[in-house]
Amino acid sequence: MNAPHMNDTTADAATLDATAAPAGRPALTRREQKDAYENNKLFKRIVRQVGQAIGDFNMIEQGDKVMVCLSGGKDSYAMLDVLLRLRERAPIDFDIVAVNLDQKQPGFPEHVLPEYLKQVGVPFHIENQDTYSIVKRLVPEGKTTCSLCSRLRRGILYRVAGELGATKIALGHHRDDIVQTLLLNMFYGGKLKGMPPKLQSDDGKNIVIRPLAYVKETDLEKYAELREFPIIPCNLCGSQPNLKRAEMKALIREWDKRFPGRVENMFNALAKVVPSHLMDTTLYPFQSLRASGVADPQGDIAFDEEPCASGDDTAAPGGAQPISIVQFDDL
């Protein structure tokens, strides 16, 4: 059974009167009304985008047991929070279990996540594995630990998913993570490869989903602040300087400010691939290509002057502006 879009009814049901004050309190000021209105828009937008991503990629199906990987960061908190709200009104039934991998990093507050998960009433499992010592022993001082740490973490989470009977593993990567991965692979890996919203795991035994695939990181930052999640900072990899991913993050933030629409268009391009206009001979039969006498609808007309003129994000102020073609960012 395919997972239908779960965004419309849930977002509408969750909508509150943004200008109404609680009983017994004075009427909201104009500033408070504006803040409440913007917060409500933010919540509706995130719920809609998550619901759309789930439907577009059939991420969650009837009877699924979704293992939500909770790190203690803003993204995984938001993912769990929105999935719980979506489940309340979803047209399908599915279970959620939250899983945290305690890697025994110094200073990690072990009590925070269990207390939070008990408070929200979510079944959870804390997996205790000292990967921190392994990483510190094997990675030379001054080198980034992300690669080894990620491999160790993936293997453990795949095993835990099997032990818990989970049918889907949900990770908290968002739109910006996906674009960053695309740029990293292009700039440093020499390949066109991103971070798919849904994929088969490395071991071939699990399906990994990314429900936040359509959500901007800035929206998640605002949402985490609004919901007051008990954020746990990562003092292993998050504090390492000069990480290439951090460079990509800064680049994307700068583009968002200077060229509105550019990052959205890059993200949208991942779903509009034209193999005949790339160079991968495994994706398109260039060697056997012959003139057919039939025009290619995806041919070089895409580079003619007229359609490009309105999408030039380097145009001077007052000139042509970039066209946002991302359907989920219309608020």
Curated annotation (Swiss-Prot):
Residues 8-23 have a biased composition (Low complexity). CDD domains: TtcA-like (cd24138). A motif (PP-loop motif) lies at residues 71-76. Gene3D superfamilies: HUPs (3.40.50.620). Residues 1-31 are annotated as: Disordered. It is an enzyme of class 2 (transferase). It is found in: Cytoplasm. Binds 1 [4Fe-4S] cluster per subunit. The cluster is chelated by three Cys residues, the fourth Fe has a free coordination site that may bind a sulfur atom transferred from the persulfide of IscS. Pfam families: ATP_bind_3 (PF01171). GO terms for biological process: tRNA thio-modification. Catalyzes the ATP-dependent 2-thiolation of cytidine in position 32 of tRNA, to form 2-thiocytidine (s(2)C32). The sulfur atoms are provided by the cysteine/cysteine desulfurase (IscS) system. Homodimer. The thiolation reaction likely consists of two steps: a first activation step by ATP to form an adenylated intermediate of the target base of tRNA, and a second nucleophilic substitution step of the sulfur (S) atom supplied by the hydrosulfide attached to the Fe-S cluster. This is tRNA-cytidine(32) 2-sulfurtransferase.
